[in-house]
Design a protein with these regions (language model features):
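Bacterial N-terminal signal peptides that target proteins for export
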Residues: 1-8
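N-terminal signal peptide c-region/cleavage motif recognized by signal peptidases
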Residues: 14-15
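Signal peptide processing junction and immediate N-terminal pro/mature segment
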Residues: 18-19
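Metalloprotease/metallohydrolase-associated module, dominated by Zn2+-dependent proteases
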Residues: 22-86, 90-92, 137-212
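Alpha-helical segments in soluble extracytoplasmic regions
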Residues: 85-101, 132
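Active-site alpha-helix of zinc metalloproteases
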Residues: 103-107, 116
Length: 212
């Protein structure tokens, strides 16, 4: 099983030093996208990620986050301005692809579906996590300096968007639960049912409880 965390920070420029269109935090959680693909182990496709050591199949979970930060700047002189963050929009996405060899047992398929279920479970509360993180940035005031205040403003908001998505990625902690699931099932090599292993792993390491 492999989880990917991708972050993109976007910036929308409006009139001079005024970047907010509507105040507040907006979280846009897109529906999860699922796909199942088969492959020939002797000739795996180029776009298939390498399987996790110990497994012949793969569940590839890609958590995407995109933060757009807006603020209002009050220029105090030619080279100084105070920026107040007044708008944050975070878009979340989860893409899951299960890769299985052409000849695979139902037990292995169920194991990979268990990985998918864990990712889906974490994604259920991902909007709440993103909301909490973004709320900490709302209302922040930062002084920018330089001869190109618009450029400084652009860099500030891009960095803040990147900081939000980085924090979201770090706080998800889904990988630790997935690793526990693999330990419980011995990478599908024992007879523990996937549904039982999923329940045990989520009970032992639920969202928000994993260690840093």
């Amino acid at each position: 099983m492999r989880s990917w965390l991708s972050a993109i920070a976007l910036l929308t420029l409006a009139s001079p030093l005024a970047l907010a269109q509507m105040p507040g935090v907006t979280i846009n959680k897109q529906p999860a996208i699922f796909a199942k693909r088969t492959f020939d182990p002797a000739r795996p496709p180029a776009d298939m990620p390498p399987p996790t050591p110990g497994e012949d199949a793969e569940c590839d979970s890609d958590f995407l986050s995109d933060a757009n930060v807006g603020g209002q700047a009050r220029q105090t002189d030619a080279t100084h301005a105070t920026v107040k963050i007044s708008q944050i929009k975070v878009t979340l996405q989860l893409n899951i692809t299960i890769w299985t060899p052409v000849k695979v047992t139902q037990h292995v398929i169920e194991h990979e579906e268990g990985h998918s279920q864990i990712s889906e479970y974490y994604y259920q509360s991902a909007d709440k996590l993103a909301q909490q993180i973004a709320a900490n940035y709302m209302g922040k005031q930062v002084v920018i300096t330089g001869t190109d205040l618009r450029g400084e403003l652009s860099m500030l908001l891009q960095k803040m968007g990147a900081d939000i998505t980085d924090e979201y990625n770090k706080e998800l902690h889904v990988e630790q639960t997935q690793l526990r699931y693999d330990a419980v099932t011995n990478h599908s090599r024992n007879e523990v049912a996937a549904r039982d292993a999923v329940a045990q792993s989520l009970k032992e390491i639920p969202p928000g409880s994993a260690l840093h």
